[in-house]
Design a protein with these regions (language model features):
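Transmembrane alpha-helix entry/boundary detector in multi-pass membrane proteins
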Residues: 8-13, 29-56, 74, 121-122
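Alpha-helical transmembrane segments of multi-pass membrane proteins
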Residues: 20-31
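Hydrophobic cores of alpha-helical transmembrane segments in multi-pass inner/ER membrane proteins
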Residues: 50-58, 119-138
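Cytosolic juxtamembrane helix at the C-terminal end of the final transmembrane segment
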Residues: 69, 97-99, 130, 134-147
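Cytosolic juxtamembrane helix and N-cap/initiation of the first transmembrane helix
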Residues: 1-21, 137-147
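Loop-to-transmembrane helix junctions at the membrane interface
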Residues: 61-95
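Interfacial non-cytosolic loop connecting adjacent transmembrane helices
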Residues: 33-45, 88-123
Length: 147
């Protein structure tokens, strides 16, 4: 059953990690945007949509290693995943700048709820960055082990 997993190269494992990190980051973004300090605010759907698209691109890279090997689409898939995840990071950070400003630079405005919100947001951004790093690593390695 897991023979396909044994045949994966470094890029295959990095792509799986990238998909998992993207999923975790997306879940953190949704939780951070809908609970706690930001419970009543509107949620920007771009990071959610872009994370789902990046996950689908990672799955495509792992599912079709023979067809994408030495093809320009292989590089394009990873480039698109990096761009989508980078835009997600930018939107995520942009939506949390007021919380970070209140917490770090205006001592009278800092609250425990904002501190918790900011801590969770930082964890989400870290997972997005880890997904980007996984995509970059996958770009420099082979998806399938050489026979």
């Amino acid at each position: 059953m897991l023979n396909w997993l044994k045949k994966l190269g470094v890029a295959g494992y990095a792509s799986i990690l990238g998909a998992v990190f993207s999923l975790v980051a997306m879940i953190i973004y949704i939780v951070n945007s809908t609970t706690g300090y930001l419970a009543g605010s509107s949620v920007n759907a771009l990071p959610i949509i872009f994370a789902i698209l990046a996950i689908l691109l990672f799955v495509l890279k792992v599912a079709l290693p023979e067809k994408l090997q030495n093809h320009w689409l292989d590089s394009f898939i990873l480039l698109a995943a990096v761009v989508l995840l980078s835009v997600s990071i930018c939107v995520f950070v942009d939506a949390r700048t007021d919380v970070a400003g209140n917490q770090w630079f205006i001592p009278g405005m800092a609250t425990d709820a904002q501190g918790a919100c900011l801590s969770v947001a930082i964890a989400g951004v870290v997972f997005y960055v880890l997904a980007v790093v996984a995509a970059i690593v996958a770009g420099f390695c082979g998806t399938k082990k050489k026979a």
